[in-house]
Regions:
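Low-complexity, glycine/alanine/valine/leucine- and proline-rich hydrophobic stretches
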Residues: 147-156, 161-164, 177, 181-184
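Generic amphipathic alpha-helical segments used as scaffolds and interaction surfaces in large
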Residues: 27-31, 164-168, 181, 185, ...
């Protein structure tokens, strides 16, 4: 495929992008905390929310020394020290209750210093904006809290929120926000700050160049992953059919010694 044809196809894809596409949302919100602030204010129903030091970070890596690291779509902290993990999920699989619990636990763990027993934990909010109504109750927003015997709030400060991206009500703030997340044309969006960011990446030369570079990087990453998976499959095949150890299989396949550790961790 020629570079020009590839570029034109990329531009066609960019024109169809919505904020519900997490890669596009990441670009729109990257280094633009006012967009994050708006979304949080609408979802939380609190126009006083202000991000601390105008801090928000996209694709925020949170470490887990005991298990798998997690990359949050958007991480933010407000002036009250409340911490937010904002996730875009188009599939039900990625928005399960256990994932919400896991993300919540990682935020707690990363707040605690050595010797701290959690007395100073800030409130945390794991927020999933889902393309469909994954909880199937027809509501715009679902707030999940812990209760004492099903009656009184436990007030542990850990909150999980699901936002139904398919909710339609252009008379309400949340309905207009979800309209904008579904909308591919910035000219039809309600919230000016979101429309301006989407318009920059869709309808200016500089923004289009940034998006085309992002898509090129995504293709390169996908190709690298495919090559790694193919090599891994070959290693496993030799181990199974030839009864080789992992190291023997990698040597037979002429895998660079510097990559042994990487593949060993994937077996």
């Amino acid at each position: 495929m020629s570079n020009e044809r590839e570029r034109l196809e990329d531009l066609q894809r960019i024109a169809k992008f919505r904020l519900l596409d997490d890669d596009f949302m990441t670009k729109c919100f990257e280094k633009h905390p006012k967009c994050v602030e708006l979304v949080l204010r609408v979802i939380m129903g609190d126009n006083s929310i202000t991000l601390k030091d105008e801090y928000s970070q996209t694709q925020y890596l949170i470490k887990n020394l005991q298990g798998r690291d997690v990359r949050f779509d958007i991480h933010a902290v407000d002036m009250d020290r409340s911490e937010y993990d904002l996730e875009i999920q188009r599939s039900k699989r990625g928005a399960g209750a256990h994932r919400a619990r896991y993300n919540s636990s990682l935020m707690d763990a990363n707040q605690i210093d050595s010797g701290d027993y959690g007395e100073n934990l800030s409130d945390t909010y794991v927020i999933f904006i889902t393309e469909y109504d994954v909880l199937n109750k027809g509501k715009a927003i679902y707030k999940i809290e812990r209760y004492i015997d099903g009656e009184n709030l436990f007030h542990d400060g850990a909150h999980i929120i699901y936002v139904n991206g398919s909710f339609v009500d252009d008379e309400s703030a949340i309905g207009r926000l979800m309209h904008d997340f579904r909308c591919s044309n910035p000219d039809n969006m309600y919230y000016q700050i979101l429309a301006d960011r989407a318009r920059f990446f869709k309808k200016t030369e500089e923004g289009e160049q940034i998006m085309c570079k992002m898509m090129e990087d995504m293709r390169n990453t996908a190709a690298q992953k495919a090559a790694i998976n193919k090599e891994l499959a070959n290693i496993k095949a030799l181990m199974e059919t030839m009864k080789m150890s992992a190291e023997q299989a990698m040597k037979a396949l002429k895998v660079p010694a510097s990559e042994f550790k990487k593949y060993m961790a994937m077996l």
